A protein has these predicted regions:
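Membrane-interfacial helix termini and adjacent extracytoplasmic/periplasmic loops
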Residues: 58-95, 165-170
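Transmembrane-helix boundary motif in ABC transporter permease subunits
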Residues: 15-46, 59-61, 109-111, 115-117, ...
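Periplasmic/extracellular loop-to-transmembrane helix junction in inner-membrane transport proteins
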Residues: 1-18, 30-39, 69, 75-80, ...
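Interhelical loop and adjacent transmembrane-helix boundary motif
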Residues: 1-4, 165-204, 208
Length: 222
């Protein structure tokens, strides 16, 4: 069992969730309530990672984050190291690749809030910011939780993006999915099976726990 790869995968998943949690709330609410020109285009761009093969998407991110790109050069100047083939590069790539898994469920959660509830909040004089925290977010929280669970579970199993942007550097970019692939390549099916089983157990436990929490939140709101 490659515990280093598992720990790195968990760190990557937690960092991705931490970045996308506030982003999914703000972007999901904006897309749910907004009525503006170009909304369909923005939604299509958010959903783009779902239809592109991970290796293709990873290739374009590799080009965008490379040393000769504006983003890569700026990162090199600010932090003194390359963005590609680093853990930080994996986090950035994972955040971009998981945008649809984070934003779409949150958006659906906000869209499910009755218009009458939002109108009542406005009638009571709540500012948009207070309405978000006092009314919208508690009602949309099951959707937000679903978004974070999907993001966490999807990040744990990411392969194509990780391989293209981060490679397989032990202790830096070698995630559990890459470690499983390496074991299969070495015909170590027992080792690969053990790591795959651990990954399934973590994902199942996360989903089960979140379903239980969502049910509790739903009963309280009811």
């Amino acid at each position: 069992m490659d515990w280093t790869a598992l720990t790195l995968s968990l760190h990557l998943a937690l960092w991705t969730v931490a970045v996308l949690l506030p982003l999914s709330i703000l972007a999901g609410r904006w897309l749910a309530y907004g009525r503006f020109r170009g909304k369909g285009l923005i939604e299509a761009l958010v959903m783009l990672p779902l239809v592109l093969p991970p290796t293709v998407f990873g290739f374009y991110l590799l080009i965008a984050f490379g040393r000769n790109s504006p983003v890569g050069a700026l990162w090199q100047d600010l932090f003194g190291g390359p963005l590609v083939f680093s853990f930080e590069g994996l986090v950035v790539a994972s955040v971009i690749f998981n945008l649809p898994f984070a934003i779409q469920p949150a958006q659906r959660g906000f869209e499910a809030i009755p218009v009458e509830v939002r109108e009542a909040a406005a009638t009571c004089g709540l500012s948009p910011w207070r309405a978000l925290w006092k009314v919208d977010l508690p009602l949309a929280w099951p959707g937000v939780m679903t978004a974070m669970v999907l993001t966490f579970a999807h990040t744990l199993g990411e392969f194509g993006i990780v391989l293209m942007v981060g490679g397989s550097i032990p202790g830096e970019t070698r995630t559990i999915a890459i470690a499983i692939y390496d074991r299969v390549q070495a015909f170590d099916m027992a080792g690969a099976g053990t790591m795959a089983a651990v990954l399934v157990a973590i994902s199942f436990t996360t989903i089960a726990l979140t379903s239980w929490l969502s049910a509790r939140v739903g009963r309280r709101l009811a």
